Regions:
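DNA polymerase processivity clamps
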Residues: 1-178
Length: 178
């Protein structure tokens, strides 16, 4: 799948802002999934998980998935906006640059958590009594136009939405009267 860097840049910026520092190597990067639904880039820092979606092109979709480490993601984000990047089952390429997938096993539970948070069953989680729920906006400041949608029952997860992005973040519980 061929994608202009201009379209890819917001997703790469979101992932770079979320990962790094003391993040374990198996999640310090982006998990790439290509299917008929389009190209999806997953990232997490153990508190927040995001899915960026790049719309499918007219090319027939070849299904593949792999992990790109943070160095690869940073290299892609520094490319000129007018360049095109090609995602294939063997890795990512753009003109004379080739990036091979990293040898890491991204935890698939991240994808399941995001999918579950965006299903209506999420609303059936039990009401939490005796706690105030808060979110640290500093953890999400790098995501442009992000909206936090708190759980209506006070559960400790909130949905995240931004252009081309969906995800969830964990809350910080504060006992009443603390």
């Amino acid at each position: 799948m061929k994608v202009p860097v201009r379209e890819l840049k917001p997703a790469l910026t979101n992932a770079i802002g979320l990962t790094g520092g003391d993040t374990p190597s198996m999640i310090n990067g982006v998990y790439v999934v290509n299917s008929k639904a389009g190209l999806k880039l997953y990232a997490t820092d153990r508190v927040t998980a995001i899915e960026n979606r790049i719309e499918p092109t007219v090319e027939p979709a070849v299904e593949f998935e792999y992990f790109l480490d943070r160095e690869a993601v940073e290299l892609l984000s520094k490319m000129a906006l007018n360049r095109a990047v090609t995602f294939t089952p063997d890795g990512v390429s753009s003109q004379n640059i080739e990036i091979k997938p990293a040898d890491e096993n991204f935890p698939k539970t991240v994808i399941e958590l995001i999918d579950n948070a965006w299903k209506d069953a999420w609303l059936e989680l039990p009401k939490v009594e005796g706690w105030d729920i808060g979110y640290n906006p500093a953890l999400l400041k790098h995501i442009k136009d992000v909206v936090i949608i708190p759980h209506p029952n006070g559960f400790n997860q909130a949905r995240l939405i931004a252009p081309g992005l969906r995800g969830l973040t964990m809350a910080k519980k504060v006992k009443h009267g603390s």
